[in-house]
Regions:
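Class I S-adenosyl-L-methionine
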Residues: 293-341
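Conserved proline-anchored active-site loop of SAM-dependent methyltransferases
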Residues: 23, 37-51, 58-63, 203-222, ...
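Conserved SAM/SAH-binding loop
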Residues: 193-198
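General small-molecule cofactor/ligand-binding pocket signal
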Residues: 57, 190-192, 310-312
Length: 341
């Protein structure tokens, strides 16, 4: 019996799942004739999922999040019975004799050796199924996304991969599940794996939703292992945390000097009637790395280049995976720009 999972079954830094009702309320009460939605920094895709009845444009520069977007939002038809059979085979396969890239580099870190052997086997095999035409692009993405969710459920971490818990007490078995993505989707949905600034003007939409990184903590650092498995180039890894070279994956939005410049460039390029910008002040942190890189004044100034701006605020403490976990002053802000210039 194959279990299922949905898009919300994942801990992820900055995930807005618990704010979806509030975000939709702001849109419904202040925007008109919304038929298309651009999730510019999609992450897990939770916000895009709230607007999946619209024509979607979804973008993220991380390959792991791109696969998730394909899984949840690509209009390509999938064979769920075939996916179920593949998942059953992976869940019952004994990979204990399979030495591979994962077991050689990550055994007894985030996972025990047997789990690493299985992850490596599955990742190799699903690429083989794609290259031989046994699965299509979206089916391939569904299996990889299922693998990521399975890894997250049992990883020996605090919810991200910046480090692992070094007590040797590994629990749980890697179990892939079938994604709950059997719902109608617009045939014109577009999914991108790119720097959002580079593709911002490719699609004309009614509303563009921006939820960029807030501070200097790079997502490619926190989720380097999932990105490694997604790219599957099998690079050398370094240090205790076993990280690959991530030089080309760094986001300008995590850097104080570049964040405002990057946002202004993006805002000027967007082709939309509304810009909805989500930003968390992260409270007042003792660690400067956790402080927001953009001020409210900078955000309003930049958005005002395109139109009139309204600001909505709610108290919210998102998933932080141990980062400044005792902070209670977090506020989520929504800046809504009605584009008229």
């Amino acid at each position: 019996m194959v279990k299922t999972f949905n898009i919300s079954n994942r801990r992820y830094l900055g995930n807005k799942y618990k704010l979806l009702d509030w975000i939709k309320q702001i849109v419904n009460e202040n925007c008109v004739d919304i038929n298309s939605f651009f999730d510019v920094f999609s992450g897990t895709g939770s916000v895009a999922s709230a607007f999946k009845d619209k024509r979607l444009v979804v973008s993220d520069m991380m390959r792991s999040n791109y696969y998730a977007a394909l899984c949840w939002f690509s209009p390509e038809v999938i064979d769920r019975d075939k996916l179920k059979l593949i998942i059953e085979q992976y869940n019952t396969f004994d990979a204990s004799n399979e030495d591979n890239y994962m077991s050689r580099n990550f055994s007894n870190t985030y996972f025990d050796r047997i789990t690493c052997q299985k992850i490596g086997y599955i990742r190799d095999d699903i690429d083989h199924l794609l290259s031989t035409g046994q699965v299509n692009t979206r089916e391939h993405a569904c299996i990889i996304t299922s693998l990521f969710y399975a890894m997250d459920r049992i990883s020996h971490t605090c919810g991200h991969y910046d480090s692992f818990i070094r007590d040797g007490k590994y629990e749980g078995t890697l179990e892939l599940r079938l994604p709950e993505n059997d719902y109608p989707l617009n045939a014109e949905n577009h999914i991108y794996c790119a720097n959002s600034n580079d593709i911002a003007n490719l699609d004309e939409v009614d509303i563009a939703y921006l939820d960029p990184p807030y501070n200097s903590r790079q997502y490619c650092d926190a989720y380097h292992l999932l990105e490694n498995v997604a790219l599957w180039n099998k690079p050398e890894v370094y240090g205790v945390a076993k990280k690959m070279d991530r030089t080309q994956m760094k986001s300008k939005y995590c850097k104080s000097i570049q964040a405002a410049e990057a946002l202004e460039d993006l805002v000027r390029k967007l082709r939309c009637r509304y810009i909805l910008f989500s930003y968390n002040n992260n409270g007042k942190k003792l660690q400067c790395r956790s402080n927001a890189k953009l001020t409210d004044e900078e955000i309003v100034r930049i958005l005002s280049i395109r139109g009139d701006v309204q600001v909505f605020t709610t108290d919210y403490k998102g998933f932080e995976a141990g980062y400044d976990a005792k902070n209670k002053d977090n506020q989520e802000r929504l800046f809504l720009c009605s584009v008229n210039r």
